[in-house]
Amino acid sequence: MRISPIKRCFVVLIGLATFVAGLSPARPASAEEGQLPGGVIIYGRGFGHGRGLSQYGSYGWATVHGWSWEQILDFYYGGATGNSRSMLEAPNQEMTVWLSVMNTKQTGVVSDSGTMRLLEDPDQGRRFTSMVAREKSGAQRVYQVWGSNQRKCLNESDSPEAAGFALLGEFNETASFVTNASQDPAAAALDTVGLCEPKSSSLNQVRYYRGIVRAMNNSKNENRTINIARLDDYLRGVVPRESPASWGDAAGGAGMNALRAQAVAARSYSVTENRYAGLAKTCDTQDCQVYGGAALRTSVNASPSVLESANTDRAVAETTGVIIRTPQGAVVRTEFSSSNGGRTAGGTFPALVDAGDLSADSSLMVWTRAFSAAQIVAKYPQVGILTAVTTTNDGLGGDWGGYTLDVTISGTAGSVKVSGWSFRTSFALPAPWFGATPVFGAPLESGVVGSMLFVGDSIGQSIAPEFAAIVAPAYPSINFQAINNRCMVGPSCVTPDKGQPDAIGVVNSLSAEQFPSVAIVQLGYNDDPNTMASDVTQVINALNARNVQRIIFVNLSTRRASQNYALSNAALAAAAQTNPNVSVLDWNAASSAPSASRWFSDDVHLTTTGRAEFTLFLRNQLDSLRAQGLITPNPESV
């Protein structure tokens, strides 16, 4: 389990003239002192529900531990359950898929080969390039169908006749479209049925599906579009959406075993699906299994992207018919998720430590989120003023005792208990395995800190919610100024026409009443490293002219090799050496561990976890400076 976040220490670089040795960071305030939490930090593990197969776990088992796909499946679904791998009696059975983006819409289709036909058409010799089915106005379950030899996706408001489409007739219950090749497993992806998705912006995406695309109504007589495909053809559109096809090339091809295991899990799960009686067995979103079809065009005439992959096609073909059965012979509903954080959730399948998931070390194997008390209370206003957030975990092992069973949100007006899954949903957490740590203000004996100014760029702008949850409880008087592309000094900026006002401009715009006691400058990524020393000097001079007691710079991560941020950091360190009222917070060192790569989206900007961790770093550093008396009014007394 992680230690209390406020107690985690990082390096602070400060001018030698003001360095005070031997002082530890400030003790965090506690509930016993009568303080209420200003925020809550949620530490968690994994991405998804954690039941059954972990996709990243499969990848780790295959590429690091050298396991076969059979071993992977036996680990996640076998063992104490007595489940085993088996063969389907009907491996070519049909899957029917509700295509959710088409809800209440017409069904328009295109054929690259000009061979589209309607299965209900009495004249099966007719072929078209484009067709559209619309429910007849004033009638239920009666479809009017038009066809054209032009390549076109009609909008809902378009007149088919005015667009050159000819009416084929009216058809009861369904309108089902195929091309000459769409039901052939060997067909190229673009020889299948192209479905015109609803207009987004100015474009109609066209998504291609194997098998049949059908217009029909659900039990409430609402328009729906369904794809009917052979099971393995359907899986060719599922497996690459659930696990990256590129995994198959990893570790000299050993990653194929992760894809094979995924194919079997997806197949067994599919066979158990029967969600929408009279309509479809399954859906195309993560509520069921993500299904992308065979190919995609971003507009009707745009260059296509084939969504199927040779690796995942191979994984499906090489495991065809294989599913998981119970000892009694029933097909197992083989749930799976992205990452279990190093331990399966238990339930239908035993709770197991997952060395494969730990080895894969996915970006969401561990994660951090931060929420202010106001954000928590906004979800549960009946509790009044927040006093605590506590979790009850399953006790089956791992951080915080295991997966979260329920969460109690307590306040001055009462408390609310919700399930771990419900809390996860309310706050968009990656998984239901987490623990909650309160964030309090400064200890009551801490020195008073005057008004503060924060000047930041897009990094600073991105942490505004986390700042309110983690920093503001202890430092409430902060003038927070952060915008994209901001630099220290505009004229020497990489993009001088953007990010205005620059740091100098922000400082110069302050009225006398706004002059801060402490200034935090989180800038530099947009500055030219070659002029950084001069830029920093100008900012220091501007702040000194306004009698700022302590000037704090945050140095830069050097992960991005395309810029010489080490030179920028050297300029900041030199400024701290020569200016006794300047401190530099060493974010570069604090974020340099390989495991911290999950904090960055592009080696500069931060992921959601990175935003929480960066803000926590700032809070810890400010607390350390406060303990040393460097941001309180009388540092000489320390």
Task: Please place each PLM-identified region on the residue numbering.
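Solvent-exposed loop/turn segments at secondary-structure junctions
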Residues: 46-49, 79-80, 105, 232, ...
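N-terminal secretory targeting modules
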Residues: 15, 23, 439-455, 459-461, ...
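Conserved, single-site charged/polar hotspot
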Residues: 2-446, 604
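Conserved SGNH/GDSL esterase-like catalytic core that processes O-acyl groups on lipids
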Residues: 449-455, 459-535, 560-566
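Active-site segments of SGNH/GDSL-like serine hydrolases
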Residues: 520-526, 540-569
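Sec-exported extracytoplasmic/periplasmic mature domains
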Residues: 62-67, 74-81, 240-244, 264-275, ...
